[in-house]
């Protein structure tokens, strides 16, 4: 521990002069969405706030770069990563401010779900496992999403530092790739769409096009399950704080958590991988159980994560700290 603390604040002999690779990813996404904002300026509800929000992120990124340049050490490197991971909570609802003005596609995904499986798994899963134990387990898995990401980043920082920048590049890149899809493929997920069309239509297999309904309505169904559970309330509180009718396809919960598991597999830390595996499986199941995603979303989230991981791992093969 003593050596770890010493290494934490030991000045680097050859500090990085410019932005880190993951910060360039953030700036690329910021520029892309800024162009979209200007193109849709007269349509968006509050484009000025979106522009100023991006300027603040640029300023914060520059400030963290300056802190690192003044004190170039592992601690300030970690702080730079922590800031960008923390800002994901701002970027997520921002996707809704753009895609709320695009035609909603839930009616297509719900119909594909019906055609593929002959039912709506998001409607039936919780009914098949209604008990408090199952409810709390799935809600616990869903609530473990961000802690799982943080645990992966902290593990690489503390135990596999030479690939810390590489791992954070892969995690943040995958997030922003999913966010681009969320913007241009406006799917809200069952909890919002079922609420909009009524459960009677869902059970009858009728999935009408709601057009721009979610531009004016953000109501969703309460999560199914044991309503007095601790983890149930954690999930509901998170939904109340920042959930928007956006980001259903593909499931980034499944996608990014899969990438975290693959990162642990890449380092061959099978003990940590085995420890997180139950939470990972519960999380993947929970996306459908709590009606946040269609089953299609979860499947594509898993497949896309494997593809993204392979591509990003290859791209980042030179991002290893000597």
Give each language-model segment a name.
Residues 20, 228-322:
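Membrane-embedded catalytic cores of phosphoryl/pyrophosphoryl-handling enzymes
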Residues 31-39, 87-93, 175-183, 280-289:
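Aromatic-anchored segments of alpha-helical transmembrane domains
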Residues 56-60, 141-153, 176, 249-261:
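Hydrophobic alpha-helical transmembrane segments
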Residues 184-266:
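Membrane-interfacial catalytic/cofactor-binding modules of polytopic membrane enzymes
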Residues 2-57, 75-149:
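N-terminal transmembrane-helix/juxtamembrane module of multi-pass inner/ER membrane proteins
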Residues 78-83, 150-185, 192-205:
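Interfacial segments of alpha-helical transmembrane regions
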Residues 65-74, 154-162, 264-268, 310-316:
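Structural signal for the C-terminal ends of transmembrane alpha-helices
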Residues 57-69, 147-152, 302-306, 312:
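Hydrophobic cores of alpha-helical transmembrane segments in multi-pass inner/ER membrane proteins
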């Amino acid at each position: 521990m003593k050596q770890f603390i010493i290494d934490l604040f030991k000045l680097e002999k050859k500090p990085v002069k410019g932005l880190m690779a993951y910060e360039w990813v953030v700036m690329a996404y910021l520029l892309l969405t800024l162009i979209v904002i200007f193109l849709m300026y007269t349509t968006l509800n509050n484009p000025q706030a979106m522009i100023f929000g991006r300027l603040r992120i640029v300023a914060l990124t520059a400030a963290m770069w300056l802190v690192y340049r003044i004190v170039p050490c592992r601690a300030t490197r970690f702080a730079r990563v922590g800031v960008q991971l923390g800002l994901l909570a701002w970027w997520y609802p921002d996707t809704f401010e753009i895609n709320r003005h695009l035609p909603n596609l839930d009616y297509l995904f719900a119909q594909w779900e019906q055609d593929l499986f002959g039912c709506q798994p998001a409607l039936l899963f919780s009914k098949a496992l209604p008990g408090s134990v199952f409810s709390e387990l799935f809600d616990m898995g869903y609530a473990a999403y961000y802690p799982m990401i943080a645990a992966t980043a902290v593990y690489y920082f503390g135990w596999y530092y030479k690939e810390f920048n590489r791992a954070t590049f892969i995690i943040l890149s995958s997030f922003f790739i999913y966010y681009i899809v969320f913007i241009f493929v406006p799917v809200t997920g069952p909890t919002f769409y079922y609420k909009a069309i009524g459960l009677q239509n869902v059970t009858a297999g009728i999935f009408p096009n709601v057009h721009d309904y979610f531009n004016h309505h953000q109501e969703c169904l309460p999560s199914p399950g044991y309503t007095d559970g601790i983890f149930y309330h954690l999930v509901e509180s998170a939904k109340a704080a920042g959930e928007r009718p956006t980001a259903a396809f593909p499931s980034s919960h499944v996608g990014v958590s899969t990438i975290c598991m693959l990162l642990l597999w890449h380092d061959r830390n099978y003990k940590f991988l085995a420890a997180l595996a139950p939470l990972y499986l519960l999380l993947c199941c929970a996306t459908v159980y709590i009606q946040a995603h269609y089953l299609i979303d979860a499947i594509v989230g898993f497949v896309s994560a494997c593809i993204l991981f392979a591509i990003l791992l290859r791209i980042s093969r030179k991002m290893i700290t000597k």
